[in-house]
């Protein structure tokens, strides 16, 4: 019956029957040796997988760049490439993303990085700083260990490819343009058109090829990864004929690579299309492959061994695969420092831009305020905008933005993504006393209390009777609105079903279809609805928004202790707040009692750190200097305060908290761990196990 159906189908369209099944991963190969191994891979996978797939087929191209283009054109689906090529694949127009990573080390302690090293023969008499004019062996142009890392160290910033080509007297750099840069291919051993080829058709291509170039006395130094010498020389006596060049201009044995390497770089990764990339199918295929044909699994076919050559399809040093988190693109996979180093290596001299700060704004309201600031900043500030806090954190981590102010909950995520606190928000004193200038800037930051606020009229409601009530939260992931109250509830219940504790909630940033968004109002200003959006488009977002939610719909609001005072007794002229009285509200204490809102010091859920400005380490000092200058102009009592107010917003808490008195020094709290403190870090750990973050998964993938 199935055959008859196919015959009928073919009568209408022969192409349909010849097309690959949807459950097929088309693997791209770059040489006849890889094509041969791919054929064995396909044949052996066919034996173990069900007829419906996943299947693997093989596509032949002449180089990794050709494979990247084939994947973009939907002529192939996957290829394993070095981190330097992950950079290339992630750029427009390709926009590919890493979906699976090789891991090394051991299965108990998988490492998704390796060491880039410079190997020389023992007895040669030069150090790393004396390599100019020597003969060099490289794995391939654009490869991490073979090109990007060593040339980034040896050349001044922004030197460009032409300067790199002139640094050595002669080289073998497979994949280089031998017509444009003949010296880069002078030492290569391929014949005819295969000389300097970007595949195993060039004898000195890849890790083992570059080492062979050194072994055969063609070059003076080989730039490879730390396992290359071990793979090619299993006998220690043979390895002892080689040494590593260290960055401190000493030499060490090849076994001592952990103390003598050029850089740690991310492992090779499988890349696929960002849209319709078959990530699930690729992972299913490779997971089955490693289970059946991984290290010491089968004598018939070895996935991580190459009888036809070295490092075919996957590197021979690979022990297995790890799935790359979905939020991780090429920039997050490689990390900002490595990504920026490649950009510097490729940049043409004289094209550097003047130093500025790119501020990340969340939502349109923040962007509007940021643009107003930018116009008056004297050209030192530009603006970028994203929809969520986490999107902004990712943008800063990737170098697409430079700074923003964050709540402690998001500061934790930012820290895990490699960002550092720069300055802290110091809040206005409740006694009305102002601290001007350096007095405020150098005053230790105190933070605030997280409180549970209820209406005084709900006299029977206590902390112990909150189950089944309606709750209002400033946003998911924030200290006062989420981390602390939900951590309390988790400690009480021991359950991660925190969305079932309350009957209805407004927790901006949650699934709009869930009960955690049931109370949310969407846009109050007549703009298109943004129900439960984690920004100011949601009317119940933020501290005042959560209090408004309590007034109009809820039973309890989780906010910071000044929130009620800031929105009552005429301090907030908006219609919902103008008639509110401070005595209309009370605080729920964890011991089951209630107290007036003025007694937060003895009735709170936790004391948490102030919001803080974060940036990357390389930009932190510049951001700090810029902000000190800007708050002298536009801070409270600033010289240009009438033109623009940093700490005042058209809605609430845009860019900075509205009750910020100044941005203050951190004293000694210069890491996110020191800034947040051990108790707060534990509270985050409790809640994070119930509500995982895709960005946090991506930022901790390499073990941060």
UniProtKB/Swiss-Prot annotation:
Q: Which residues form the Transferrin-like domain?
A: 25-347, 357-689
The major lineage groups are: Eukaryota, Metazoa, Chordata, Craniata, Vertebrata
What tissues has this protein been observed in? Blood plasma (at protein level).
Taxonomically, the superkingdom here is Eukaryota
An example Gene Ontology biological process: iron ion transport
Q: Identify this protein by name.
A: Inhibitor of carbonic anhydrase
Q: Does the keyword Disulfide bond apply?
A: yes
Subunit structure as annotated in this protein's UniProt entry = Monomer. Interacts (via transferrin-like domain 2) with CA2.
Could you describe the post-translational modifications of this protein? N-glycosylated.
Family from the record: Belongs to the transferrin family.
Q: Where does this polypeptide localize?
A: Secreted
Q: Which organism is it from?
A: Sus scrofa (Pig)
Going by the UniProt annotation, this protein carries glycans at: 491
InterPro entries for the chain: Transferrin, Transferrin-like_dom, Transferrin_Fe_BS
One GO cellular component term: plasma membrane
Signal peptide interval:
1-19
Q: Which UniProt keywords apply?
A: Disulfide bond, Glycoprotein, Repeat, Secreted, Signal
- List all disulphide bridges recorded for this chain: 28-67, 38-58, 137-213, 172-188, 175-196, 185-198, 246-260, 360-392, 370-383, 417-699, 440-662, 472-549, 496-690, 506-520, 517-532, 589-603
Task: Report which gene this protein is encoded by.
Answer: INHCA
State what this protein does.
Answer: Inhibitor for carbonic anhydrase 2 (CA2). Does not bind iron ions.
């Amino acid at each position: 019956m199935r055959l008859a159906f196919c015959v009928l189908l073919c009568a209408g369209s022969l192409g349909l029957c010849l097309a690959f099944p949807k459950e097929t991963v088309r693997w791209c190969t770059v040489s006849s040796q890889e094509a041969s191994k791919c054929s064995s891979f396909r044949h052996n996978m066919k034996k173990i997988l069900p007829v419906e797939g996943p299947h693997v087929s093989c596509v032949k191209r002449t180089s990794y760049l050709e494979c990247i283009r084939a994947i973009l054109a939907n002529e192939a689906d996957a290829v394993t490439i070095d981190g330097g090529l992950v950079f290339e694949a992630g750029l427009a127009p390709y926009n590919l993303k890493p979906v699976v990573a090789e891991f090394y080390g051991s299965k108990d302690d998988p490492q998704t990085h390796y060491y880039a090293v410079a190997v020389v023969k023992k007895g040669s008499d030069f150090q790393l700083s004396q390599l100019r004019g020597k003969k060099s062996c490289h794995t391939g142009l654009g490869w991490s260990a073979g090109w990007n890392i060593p040339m980034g160290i040896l050349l001044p910033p922004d030197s460009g490819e032409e300067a790199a080509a002139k640094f050595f007297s002669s080289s073998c750099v497979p994949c280089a343009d031998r017509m444009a840069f003949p010296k880069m291919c002078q030492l290569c051993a391929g014949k005819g058109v295969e000389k300097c080829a970007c595949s195993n058709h060039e004898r000195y291509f890849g890790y083992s090829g570059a080492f062979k170039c050194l072994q055969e006395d063609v070059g003076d130094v080989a730039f490879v990864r730390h396992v290359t010498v071990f793979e090619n020389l299993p006998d220690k006596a043979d390895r002892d004929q080689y040494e590593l060049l260290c960055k401190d201009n000493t030499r060490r044995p090849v076994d001592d690579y952990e103390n003598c390497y050029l850089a740690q770089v991310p492992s090779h990764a499988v890349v696929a299309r960002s849209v319709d990339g078959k990530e699930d199918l690729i992972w299913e295929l490779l997971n089955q492959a490693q289970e059946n044909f991984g290290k010491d699994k089968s004598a018939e076919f070895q996935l991580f061994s190459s009888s036809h050559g070295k490092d075919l399809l996957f590197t021979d040093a690979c022990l297995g695969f790890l799935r790359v988190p979905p939020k991780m693109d090429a920039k997050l996979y490689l990390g900002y420092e490595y990504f920026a180093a490649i950009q510097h290596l490729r940049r043409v001299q004289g094209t550097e831009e003047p130093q500025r700060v790119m501020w990340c704004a969340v939502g349109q309201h923040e962007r509007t305020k940021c643009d107003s600031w930018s116009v008056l900043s004297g050209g030192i500030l530009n603006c970028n905008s994203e929809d969520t806090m986490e999107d902004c954190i990712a943008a800063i981590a990737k170098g697409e933005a430079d700074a923003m102010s964050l709540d402690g909950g998001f500061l934790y995520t930012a820290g895990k993504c490699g960002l550092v606190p720069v300055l802290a928000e110091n809040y206005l004193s409740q006694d009305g006393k102002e601290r001007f200038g350096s007095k405020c800037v150098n005053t230790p930051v105190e933070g605030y209390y997280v409180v549970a606020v209820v209406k005084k009229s709900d006299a029977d409601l206590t902390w112990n009777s909150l189950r089944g009530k309606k709750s209002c939260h400033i946003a998911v992931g924030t200290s006062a609105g989420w981390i602390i109250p939900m951590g309390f509830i988790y400690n009480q219940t021991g359950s991660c079903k925190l969305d079932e504790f309350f009957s209805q909630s407004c927790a901006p940033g949650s699934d709009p279809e869930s009960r955690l968004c049931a109370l949310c109002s969407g846009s109050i200003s007549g703009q298109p609805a943004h129900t439960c959006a984690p920004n100011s488009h949601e009317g119940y977002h933020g501290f005042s928004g959560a209090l408004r939610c309590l007034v109009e719909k809820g039973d309890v609001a989780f906010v910071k202790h000044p929130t009620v005072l800031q929105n009552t007794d005429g301090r907030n002229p908006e219609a919902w707040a103008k008639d509110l009285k401070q005595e209309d509200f009370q605080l729920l204490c964890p011991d089951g009692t209630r107290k007036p809102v003025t007694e937060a010091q003895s009735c709170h859920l936790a004391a948490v750190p102030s919001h803080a400005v974060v940036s990357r380490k390389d930009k932190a000092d510049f951001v700090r200097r810029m902000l000190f200058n800007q708050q002298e102009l536009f801070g409270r009592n600033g010289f240009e305060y009438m033109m623009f107010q940093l700490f005042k917003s058209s809605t609430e808490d845009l860019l900075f908290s509205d009750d910020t008195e100044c941005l203050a020094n951190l004293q000694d709290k210069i890491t996110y761990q020191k800034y947040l403190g051990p108790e707060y870090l534990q509270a985050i750990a409790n809640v994070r196990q119930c509500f995982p973050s895709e960005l946090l998964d991506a930022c901790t993938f390499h073990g941060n």
